[in-house]
Structures are given as structure tokens and as C-alpha cells.
């Protein structure tokens, strides 16, 4: 087998692959062995039909498709290695109609390859470090959040619903006079202002009391996942069975100790929260500075991000989002239902971020190559020890879980490249 690579405009090129007749015949033999196992012929055990009889009955061309499914992927994999290219998407294969047994076989693959960024300025970039300040109002807000998490719900007697209350409701939705699937619920605890229902639903329940009913009229979003409801007006017949309000605990020294066993008073709690918030803001400021440097270096580089790489990154982002939803007791299907969005909508929202991620990654790889930045054995060993301590595992177990150290090595190289940008930047306070 031989391969010839011709680079074209952008990140696309054509790989011409020549397969000798001997390899064609070998693929035909494999195809026959596969196909004959599925054929029952009187007088022969299953899979034992002679090749000559098979060809007389079905024709040798009946093996071509199976042979192509063997020879094309195998030859393509060898060809990209021989050509030294790195595809980033599935190839477009052409020329398979030229396949004939006993003859040399030539086909082409149009391939999108990994771009080679033309780097712009990445040293001496000017960035301003964000100031770090923690106000009393921020400390108060955090304490209020902690109090809210400890709040208890108490039933409101003969009082109207206000934002923040939880209404226990029965509801049924109608489009026109017809109820629709999924539009009915009983004893549903709905926190008013949570935004968990269709836009406009929760606001219409403010002012309603327990025991009262109300028709809530909403319009489903145009992009709602259920096509039969998208853009349509619906009426929900809602009965409020119970109204509950949050009652916050009293903030005193005893409760401060309950919130944090390491403090003895409210003042100590406030001081600790202020210190932790300051540390968090310092970390956020440092991260923002790094992000800005990386973004500037990426913007200064010239190259086109292939659509296949954007799609692959969008797939990863969608998978990550689904995993985060699962930790909250949800999944993507439920998210689409409650948000009124489809997978296509969500992918569209992620596309710009996905392209930015790929662009940044390729830029950093190019800078690392230009500056000869590598992850040393000592770097990898130190990171393995750190991870082993963090997850209470051995270094060997960590390596096994990662499937080797290649991913870790690349992560370290990228981190060192970002640090290189920081060390060579012009930073103002």
C-alpha cells in the first residue's frame, strides 16, 4: 500500500491511496469467510459452502461491499500514518466504485487536518490585574445565604403568595379545550421566583391564597421541545392547596457555631467568611488574568478552526452539561422539557464557546512547540503524587485510571505554557 498527500486550501487535503492486488484478494478472502457463515446451503454445514460454488450462485461481486468495509478503513489508517497527518473529522471517501477483485485498487479520501496556527504576539501582552476587595455587604449576603439554607418552611394562614414562597399546587394544562400530555400535576411544591416553570407562570400566582384557584395563561416558547406545543397559548387551571414561607433562624453566637464549628461567635464567623472570600477573589483574579492573556494570544493567531473540531468540542460540552445535570437529579430530556429548548438550540448556544475552546487549545499547543515547552518526568511524577494524595490512591492506580500519562503530560504542558504567558506579560495592578 502507498499513499500520496496533497494539501489544498485551508485545512483540507486529498489522500490518494493505492492498494496492491494482493491486499485486495486478501480482503476478498476475509469477506467470503464472513459472509459464508450466514448462509445455509443443503448438503453443507453452515459456513462450509465452497468458494467456487458461492461465486457461481451469488456472483463474486456480492463480496465487494464487505471487502470494501475491510480494506478501506484499514488502508486509510495506514495511509494517514504514512503521510504523517492528523485528521480531525471523518474523511470523504471516493473511488470505491473502482474496486475489482484481482486488480490494484485506488481510492481517495478528502481529509480535514489539524490546523497549524500562524502565531501573532503572545509575549509582552498587556493586562490589568483585577483589584481584590471584600465589602461588609458581601459578607452579609453570604451569611444570609447560609441562613436561608437552614430556613424552615412554615404554613401561611390566609395570606397571599409573594415571591420566595412555596406554593403546593394541583394543575392541569389545556390548549383550547384539550388537555395535553405532561401538563398535569398534583401536590407540586413550586417556589415562586425559581424560574422552574414556563416563563410567566409563577408570576401569575402572586397574590393568590391557599384554597383559591386561578387560570394561568402562558405562551410556550417557539423553540419548545414538544413541537405540538411550541408557540401555542395554553391555560393552566391551578388550585393552590397550601402556601409556605421561609422562616430564617436567628443569627447569634450559638447559630454561628452551628454553621462553622471552628468559630465561637458571629464576629469570628464574619471574619472567617471575609478571609475566605478574599482568598477566593484572589484566585478568581489570577484566573481572569490568565484567561485574558490566553484569549489575547488566541485572537492574535491566524488560522481557521475546522467545523469538525467545533462539533466534537460541542459534543464534549453537551456531555459535560448532562453529567452536571445528573448530579442535580436531572437529565438532558428533563432539561429540554422544563426549559423549552431542544438539543439543537443548546448546541447552537454552545457553538461559539466550543470554537473558542478549540482555538485557545490549538494556540497554546503552537506556543508550546515554538518555545519548546515540555512536561518533564519530574513534572509528571509530582502531579501523580499530588493526585494520589488527593484521591487516596496509588500513583499506579492513577496512571491506570487515566489510561497512561499522555493526557496528564499534555495538561501539564498547557499549564506551563499559560505560566509562560504570565511570566512574559506586562501586568498592571
Swiss-Prot record:
Highest taxon of the lineage: Bacteria
Reactions that this protein is recorded to catalyse: [protein]-peptidylproline (omega=180) = [protein]-peptidylproline (omega=0)
Keyword Nucleotide-binding: no
Enzyme class: isomerase
Entries under InterPro entries matching the protein: PPIase_dom_sf, PPIase_FKBP_dom, Trig_fac, Trigger_fac_C, Trigger_fac_C_sf, Trigger_fac_ribosome-bd_bac, Trigger_fac_ribosome-bd_sf, Trigger_fact/SurA_dom_sf
Enzyme nomenclature, EC number: 5.2.1.8
PROSITE patterns on file: FKBP_PPIASE
Keywords in alphabetical order: Cell cycle, Cell division, Chaperone, Cytoplasm, Isomerase, Rotamase
Domain remarks: Consists of 3 domains; the N-terminus binds the ribosome, the middle domain has PPIase activity, while the C-terminus has intrinsic chaperone activity on its own.
Listed name of the protein: Trigger factor
Native source species: Lysinibacillus sphaericus (strain C3-41)
